[in-house]
Amino acid sequence: MVAAQAKLVYHLNKYYNEKCQARKAAIAKTIREVCKVVSDVLKEVEVQEPRFISSLNEMDNRYEGLEVISPTEFEVVLYLNQMGVFNFVDDGSLPGCAVLKLSDGRKRSMSLWVEFITASGYLSARKIRSRFQTLVAQAVDKCSYRDVVKMVADTSEVKLRIRDRYVVQITPAFKCTGIWPRSAAHWPLPHIPWPGPNRVAEVKAEGFNLLSKECHTLAGKQSSAESDAWVLQFAEAENRLQLGGCRKKCLSLLKTLRDRHLELPGQPLNNYHMKTLVSYECEKHPRESDWDESCLGDRLNGILLQLISCLQCRRCPHYFLPNLDLFQGKPHSALENAAKQTWRLAREILTNPKSLEKL
């Protein structure tokens, strides 16, 4: 048994050093190329409208606010200033979303975003995005990369297609630090010793983002309050949970396997599903020793089996907001197909670790 585990870990490490590192290098190169174009577009936006200031800065070889959805798809979060005159209201009526309401006694004129405040005193995510979309469309025509970049049509999101190969979504957002949403108040679970109190404090201090984007849970329910709502996102908090042991390596293996074998019709699976399942695996295996290099095979296998279970149940709860289903809106046939493919992949890796050389 120990010999079989060691053999699997050996082949996973080989796969990581060859395939995962090559994937990382290729994506890093793409990110540099894509960010040059996005920065140029945002610079042009800022000239037209100084309230939209580019926050796409490179620090320690990574760009703040950039998320890799897949090797050809990215999201750039554009942090906006001055949320201060608004109260964050998160009553759970819109799963995964919250609203920003003008604080009592504050005048509209005190806000930097005065014309985007609704009659009821809410800062409208939709109105801000609509204005931003108009500015980006104008900037694309003026910027120095105008020959290689164009807007993606037929969406209220701000999406750029670059060199006909890459899609980048630019999402206006507010950063919320030092507060924690009520809809995530159950976390951490009291009976689970992971993460420890110090990491919990770090994660909560990191806070979350409020994004102006289409909320999939509200599809078909377009009342004005809902289209004015902001989507909760916990990217930095989630990144902190992946620190230590072989967690990041495990996630890198899962992303690479997804890119190569689970890029399927209907797009049932993305990197974020993998990241979510690593967090759940951490809860199931709370001891640091469970994430030792020697356990890499067990952890990967556990996550793949959990993924199959989620696909078969057609439900993958968000880690911090379990009322939010990450498979919402995905075609059932696509989820069934993904379950079969994941099962084949898991069986292949477990019964014949050497097969990783060809995967």
Swiss-Prot record:
Subcellular location: Nucleus
Function (record text): Putative nucleotidyltransferase required for several aspects of embryonic development including normal development of the eye. It is unclear whether it displays nucleotidyltransferase activity in vivo. Binds single-stranded RNA (ssRNA).
A Pfam family it matches: Mab-21
Transferase in keyword set: yes
Similarity remark: Belongs to the mab-21 family.
Protein name: Putative nucleotidyltransferase MAB21L1
Organism lineage: Eukaryota, Metazoa, Chordata, Craniata, Vertebrata
Gene Ontology annotations of biological process type: cornea development in camera-type eye
Binding partners and assembly: Monomer. Homodecamer; composed of 2 back to back homopentamers. The protein may exist as monomer in solution and oiligomerizes upon ligand binding.
GO molecular function: metal ion binding; nucleotide binding; nucleotidyltransferase activity
Protein species of origin: Xenopus tropicalis (Western clawed frog)
Signal peptide residues on this chain, from the entry's feature table: none
Highest taxon listed in the record's lineage: Eukaryota
EC number: 2.7.7.-
SMART domains in the record: Mab-21
Main subcellular location: nucleus
Family annotation (InterPro entries): Mab-21-like_nuc_Trfase, Mab-21_HhH/H2TH-like, MAB21L/cGLR
Residues holding a ribonucleoside 5'-triphosphate: 23-24, 63-66, 248, 252-255
